[in-house]
């Protein structure tokens, strides 16, 4: 016979434990002072606090235990939390953690090695099977390796009322805007992910395979054996590398002609396969004369533009003085010829092309909008800026905010309303789950996505250098997302706007699902609309200046962008959401 009392006690025991994560940098430092305070409150209540290490160094050690002594080995806490996250009793406090770029990953490896941990070097260009295996393990650690594992649910985020009221009484600084501002967003008009996207709703459960079929008839399986669920939305898209480089070259010239700073805004951390390549493209194009002139030497030094100018500077430091000086002189000549670069640190000469993880779009664009639409130049002064965001999918959001501020001036934290967010995040939805399905092709041909019966679900033509990307969005998270939006709209009596573009293949399929699943709920008296991201931005801004609130109901990327953009403008930071 079941002892329901004992079962109940076991459940309560499990639910009275909180997992507190150990991460990196500032959050790790804060933990030393904050965690004892948390424990002082939870212990009398019978709530246990358990720490788990998901820091970059911790994840490296956990994945390379075969290189360590028994005393150095640690548990794979991220894998443990990934299993725990699907359990109903899970209570996990996930602090911000590093989404490491290659330079950050390499620095962490060197630091561990210096402390006596014999972890292997990161082989950027593996030459053996063992090096290929090591690189693959490290590639799972770099970028946003934590969030896709832990984010099993959708997102419902807003600034607490107390934080909003504090910002109104103690407003943060907002730079003045000029109607004559030359700041603007530049995106591709052809050859980007947006323009090439195809989308399919899977009619029945199956397994899929991604295959490259070369123009010469050769084939290469890029991924196979992965599952698809009934009703799942899958997409494929291609970024043309040749058109991307043409775009960069044109925008560099345009920034020079307009006398504005040149900047690029990507997410090389979360989009750890595609965006470092996009970043490397602009680094190469800006310093093209240098990379072309020293191509053989740079190849010998393993200098990859994807790692930024900082990697170049570091690797030429050991060259003979005359050779190093010649390269530095050529770099200086490029600076003088090309438009001035937006800076990460003007005093130290660190540009926004130095490190791929230094300028991250969801933080960098709101910061610039808050600062009169300007960034800092090499002279340490603010200046109007060209914001290069290659893909069109979401760049219109930022251009709309810029246009609005040019016309109406800076937003006022004292009077402005709020834009909260309900985000489609669960089970690695959309682009943020695409890492293992993103490939840079080495030749011309087509990339096919086929089901287990051999039917072609999607097909994309590619050229050498192009980036192919496939995304998945499961149906259950979409249904939950719609329910969350309806519940939030009713609880707050606030308009809920689905930010979906009917002219984009993926969004067109999602619009059909949203319209279908809204019928499962009582929406009487609610204001629920579907708008393109640019139109939804304009609508939200028109309300925000009147002190009115709006709910943005978005996909995974815009969840990330909006939960930085609006909080930074409203309360000065996204850390208080």
Q: Where are each of the predicted segments found?
A:
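N-terminal amphipathic/basic-hydrophobic helices that include classical n-h-c signal peptides
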Residues: 1-14
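Extended, well-ordered protein cores
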Residues: 16-280, 289-513, 517, 521-577
């Amino acid at each position: 016979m079941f002892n329901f009392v004992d079962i109940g006690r076991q459940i309560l025991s499990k639910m009275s434990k909180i997992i507190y994560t150990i991460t990196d940098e500032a959050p790790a430092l804060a933990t030393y002072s904050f965690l004892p305070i948390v424990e002082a409150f939870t212990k009398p209540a019978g709530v246990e606090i358990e720490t788990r290490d998901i820091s970059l160094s911790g994840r490296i050690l956990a994945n390379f235990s075969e290189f360590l002594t028994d005393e150095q080995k640690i548990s794979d806490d991220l894998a443990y939390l990934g299993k725990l996250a699907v359990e109903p009793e899970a209570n996990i406090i996930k602090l911000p953690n590093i989404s490491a770029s290659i330079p950050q990953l390499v620095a962490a490896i060197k630091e561990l090695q210096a402390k006596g941990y014999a972890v292997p070097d990161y082989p950027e260009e593996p030459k053996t099977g063992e090096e290929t295996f090591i690189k693959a393990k490290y590639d799972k650690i770099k970028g946003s390796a934590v969030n896709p594992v832990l984010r099993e649910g959708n997102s419902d985020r807003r600034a607490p009322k107390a934080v909003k009221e504090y910002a109104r009484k103690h407003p943060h600084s907002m730079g003045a805007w000029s109607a004559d501002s030359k700041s603007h967003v530049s995106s591709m008009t052809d050859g980007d992910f947006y323009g090439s996207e195809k989308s399919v709703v899977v009619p029945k459960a199956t397994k899929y395979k991604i295959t490259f079929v070369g123009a010469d008839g050769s084939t290469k399986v890029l991924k196979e054996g992965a599952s698809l669920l009934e009703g799942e939305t899958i997409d494929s898209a291609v970024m043309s590398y040749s058109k991307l480089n043409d775009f960069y070259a044109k925008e560099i010239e345009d920034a020079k002609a307009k006398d504005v700073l040149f900047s690029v805004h990507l997410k090389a951390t979360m989009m750890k396969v595609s965006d470092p390549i996009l970043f490397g493209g602009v680094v190469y194009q800006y310093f093209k004369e240098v990379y072309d002139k020293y191509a053989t030497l740079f190849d010998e030094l393993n200098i990859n533009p994807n790692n930024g100018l900082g990697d170049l500077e570091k690797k030429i430091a050991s060259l003979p003085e005359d050779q190093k000086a010649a390269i530095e002189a050529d770099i200086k000549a490029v600076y003088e010829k090309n438009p001035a670069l937006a800076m990460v640190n003007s005093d130290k000469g660190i540009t926004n092309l130095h490190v791929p993880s230094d300028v991250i779009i969801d933080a960098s664009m709101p910061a610039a909008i808050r600062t009169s639409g300007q960034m800092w130049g090499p002279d340490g002064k603010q200046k109007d800026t060209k914001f290069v965001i290659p893909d069109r999918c979401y760049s219109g959001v930022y251009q709309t905010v810029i246009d609005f501020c040019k016309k109406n001036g800076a937003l006022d934290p004292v009077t402005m309303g709020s834009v909260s967010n309900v985000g489609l995040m669960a089970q690695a939805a959309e682009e943020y789950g695409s890492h293992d399905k993103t490939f840079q092709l080495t030749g011309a041909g087509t990339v096919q996505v086929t089901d287990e019966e051999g039917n072609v679900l999607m097909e994309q033509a590619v050229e050498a250098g192009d980036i192919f990307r496939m995304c998945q969005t499961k149906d259950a998270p979409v249904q939950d997302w719609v329910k969350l939006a309806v519940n939030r709209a009713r609880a707050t009596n606030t308009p809920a706007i689905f930010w979906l573009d009917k002219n984009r293949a993926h969004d067109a399929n999602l619009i059909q699902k949203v319209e279908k699943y809204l019928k499962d709920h009582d929406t009487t008296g609610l204001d629920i609309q579907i708008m393109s991201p640019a139109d939804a931005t304009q609508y939200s801004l028109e309300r925000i200046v009147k002190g009115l609130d709006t709910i943005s109901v978005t996909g995974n990327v815009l969840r990330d962008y909006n939960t930085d953009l609006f909080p930074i403008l409203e309360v000065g930071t996204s850390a208080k959401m």
